[in-house]
Amino acid sequence: MSAFNNKRNFFRIAKEKSLSFLILLLASCTSIPVTNRSGKEDTQTVFKAEESYIRPYHHLPDGTFRNPEGSIERDDYEFPWFKFTKERMSIKVKVPEGHAIPKDEVLPSLTALENEDTITWIGHVTFLIRIGGKTIITDPFFSPNAGPLALGPRRFVDPAIKLSELPKTDLLLLTHNHYDHLDSEATKNFPHKKTKVLCPLKLSKFYKDYRFKDVNEMDWYQEKQVDDLKVTFLPAVHWSKRELLDRNRTLWGSYLIEYQRKKILFCCDTASGEVYKKLGQEYGPIDIAFINIGAYEPVEIMKYSHANPAEALEIGRNLRAKKVIGMHWGTILMSLEDPFEPPTKFIANAKNFGYDEKDAVLFKIGETKTIKQILS
C-alpha cells in the first residue's frame, strides 16, 4: 500500500475514532455514570476450567465488576449531557493567589526534606509520598486535559513539576482507568520505567504496552509486600470506563500503605458507602486518609461516584482516620460547583464529624509537608 493510502486510512480512522471519542468524553472523561449496571445476584459458586471457586461479590459473571454490597445504585436517570457541558464550559475560573507555590520552590523543598517522610501535592490526585525510604507516586496525571486526544476537561493549574523533573520513584499506585487518573501521555513518557506498578485487575496491559518492567494487578483485599511496605488494595464506591463499550471491565480501588506502625490510605475516587464502616473496623485506625472532596455537582448524577466535602469527612470518620487530606479539587474543571468551594466546605464541616480544623488537611499545589507535621 502506498504512503499516500496509508496516510489517508490513518486520517479516516482518526476521524471515526474522534466521533466516538466525542460521545465517550462525557461518559468517561468527566467521571459521570451513564447507565445502571448494578447487579443483584449474590456471591455464588461458578465453574471455570472444570474447577469450582467462589466468585467474590464484586466479580460479575460477564467479567465486569461492581461496587461493594450495599452501595448506592445508579438509576436510569437521563442526564442532560449537552446542558451540563455548556454550563461547565461557561464557568470562569479565577485561581486564588497562593493556590500553588512558585515552581522554582517545589524541587528545592523536596530536596531539603529528602531524609524525612513527606507528602507533596503535584495537583488533582497526583501526590508524591515518601515513606520508609520509598518514593510513591499516585495516579500520575500531567496532561493539559483529561480525555482522549485533545478532548476533555482542561487544567486551569499546571502540575507543580514537569513529568521530566519527577524524582526517581519506587512505586506507582493506580486507582482506576478514568482519564484524570490514568494519563496516556504521562504513562508513555514516564521517566522511570523500572518503577513497580500496582494497578487494579485487567489494567496491567496498559503499562506493559508502555514498557514498564514490573507491573502487578491487584484484586480487593489482596496484599503486596514492597520491601518494608505492605500495600493492601481495598474497595471503593466508583466505576470504570475508558472506551465506548468497556464500562466496569477493569476494577477500581484504594491502597492502604503500612509502614512500621503507620497506616496511610490513598482512596480511589469514591461516593459514600457502608463499606467504609467495615473497612474502618477491619483496618482502622488509619493515620492519614486521602479522600476526594471535589466534582460533586450536579448531585443527582455525581452522588454515585464522588463524595462531597461533608461526605468525605464522614468517610474519614467511618474509616477511623485521624487526619483526612482533601484531594481531587483545584486543578481541573469537571463539574458545576465553584472549583474553590470544596476546601471551604471541607474545613467548615470538620467539627460536624468529630475533627478539629487541623485534622482536615489541605495542600497548596507543589507544597511538601512532613508526615510528622501532618500528624502533630
Language-model features and meaning:
Residues 126-132, 225-286, 303, 307-311:
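Catalytic core of the metallo-beta-lactamase
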Residues 129, 139, 176, 183, ...:
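Divalent metal-coordination and catalytic microenvironments
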